[in-house]
C-alpha cells in the first residue's frame, strides 16, 4: 500500500485543476492508506526519546535521584540506570549487569587514570563524591582487573581469560550500543559515562533542575514511516525463518530447491496488509491503524494528526495526561495525547 499524496503516489505534486480532472477533492490532505477499499490512517505514537539521559526524583526506592536512559541500536532498546546509594557509590545497571560501580565500568572501558576521570567529569572543579568513589576502587589499576572484578560480580564463573573476554563482549554489545559496538568505541563510552555522572551530580546538588519527562524535548513521535519500518523489520525476520524452514525441509527430502520455490512471495505482503487492516502492530499493540472518521473536514484533519500516548488506561499518571506548554504549536489543539 502507498500513502496517498506521498512521493510514489500518482497524485503527488498535482495542481488543484489536475486533481479535479482526476476526480479527486483538491482539499483532500492525503497522508493515509487505502487497504481493501477502506481508508486507514496510522496513528502517531508518543514515546520517550532514546539516547537521552534524564535525571529524576523517584517516588520510592533507596536513592534520592535516578538517572535513566534508553540506548537504542537498530531494533532494540536497552535501559540504563545510574543511581547513588547510601554508601556514596554510583551504581550503573544495564541488561544482566545489575548495580555495578560506575567507576569500575569506566576503568574497564580503558579510562584508567584517576586524574583523567576527574577531569572528564568536570574540568574546572572537583566533586567530592567522585573522589570518594575513586578512593574506594584505587587498588584497581589495570583494565583486565576491572573487567575481572565486574565479571565476578555478575556471576560469570569460567577461567579468568574467558571471563574477561565475555565481559568485553557484554560491554561492547549492551553498554550504550548507540555509540557503537566496536572495540575502538569503548573510550567514547567511558567519556559519555563521565558526562552522565557530571549531569547526575549537578542535579543532585540542585545546580540543574530535574528533567521533565513530559517536556516535548524529551519525547519522540513515531510517525507512519517509523511504524512501518518496525513492522517490516519484524516480518522480514519471519520471512527469513520461513525460508530456512522450507530449505531444511526440502534438503531432508533429498531435493535441492531453487530460490523461487523457497520464498512464499505472498507472506510478507499478506502480513503487512493484515496488520494495517486490523490495527494490531509489533509487540501486540492494538488500534495503531484506524478507519478515518469523515464526519466533517475538521474531524478528518484532527484524526490524521492524532497522537496516542503509550500509557494504558489503567496506569495512573496524571502529569502525563495534562496539557504541557510544549504541546502548543506542535500538537493539534483539539486532540491531546489522551485523545479527548
Task: Label the predicted regions.
Residues 27-28, 318, 328-329:
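Short beta-strand-initiation
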Residues 1-303, 307-310, 324, 337:
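N-terminal non-catalytic structural scaffold regions of very large proteins
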Residues 331-338:
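Conserved helicase core region in the C-terminal RecA-like lobe
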Residues 315-324:
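Short, basic/aromatic recognition patches
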Amino acid at each position: 500500500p502507498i500513502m496517498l499524496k506521498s512521493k510514489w503516489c500518482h497524485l503527488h505534486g498535482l495542481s488543484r485543476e489536475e486533481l479535479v480532472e482526476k476526480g479527486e477533492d483538491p482539499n483532500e490532505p492525503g497522508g493515509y492508506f487505502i487497504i481493501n477499499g477502506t481508508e486507514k490512517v496510522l496513528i502517531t505514537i508518543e514515546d520517550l526519546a532514546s539516547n537521552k539521559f534524564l535525571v529524576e526524583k523517584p517516588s520510592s526506592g533507596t536513592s534520592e535521584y535516578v538517572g535513566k536512559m534508553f540506548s537504542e541500536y537498530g531494533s532494540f532498546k536497552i535501559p540504563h540506570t545510574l543511581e547513588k546509594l547510601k554508601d556514596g557509590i554510583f551504581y550503573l545497571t544495564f541488561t544482566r549487569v545489575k548495580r555495578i560501580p560506575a567507576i569500575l565500568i569506566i576503568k574497564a572501558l580503558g579510562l584508567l587514570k584517576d586524574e583523567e576521570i576527574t577531569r572528564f567529569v568536570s574540568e574546572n572543579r572537583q566533586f567530592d563524591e567522585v573522589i570518594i568513589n575513586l578512593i574506594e576502587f584505587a587498588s584497581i589499576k589495570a583494565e583486565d582487573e576491572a573487567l575481572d572484578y565486574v565479571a565476578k560480580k555478575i556471576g560469570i564463573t569460567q577461567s579468568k581469560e574467558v571471563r574477561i573476554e565475555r565481559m568485553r563482549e557484554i560491554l561492547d554489545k549492551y553498554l550504550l550500543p548507540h555509540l557503537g559496538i566496536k572495540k575502538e568505541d569503548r573510550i567514547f563510552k567511558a567519556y559519555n559515562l563521565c558526562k552522565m555522572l557530571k549531569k547526575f551530580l549537578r542535579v543532585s546538588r540542585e545546580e540543574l533542575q530535574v528533567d521533565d519527562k513530559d517536556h516535548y524535548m524529551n519525547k519522540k513521535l513515531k510517525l507512519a514511516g517509523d511504524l512501518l519500518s518496525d513492522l517490516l523489520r519484524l516480518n522480514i525476520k519471519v520471512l527469513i525463518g520461513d525460508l530456512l524452514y522450507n530449505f531444511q525441509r526440502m534438503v531432508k527430502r533429498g531435493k535441492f530447491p531453487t530460490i523461487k520455490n523457497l520464498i512464499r512471495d505472498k507472506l510478507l505482503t499478506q502480513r503487512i496488509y493484515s496488520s494495517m487492516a486490523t490495527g494490531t502492530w509489533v509487540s501486540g499493540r492494538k488500534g495503531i491503524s484506524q478507519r478515518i472518521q469523515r464526519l466533517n473536514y475538521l474531524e478528518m484533519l484532527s484524526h490524521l494528526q492524532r497522537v496516542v500516548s503509550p500509557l494504558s488506561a489503567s496506569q495512573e499518571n496524571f502529569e502525563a495526561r495534562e496539557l504541557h506548554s510544549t504541546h502548543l504549536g506542535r500538537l493539534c489543539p483539539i486532540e491531546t495525547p489522551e485523545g479527548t
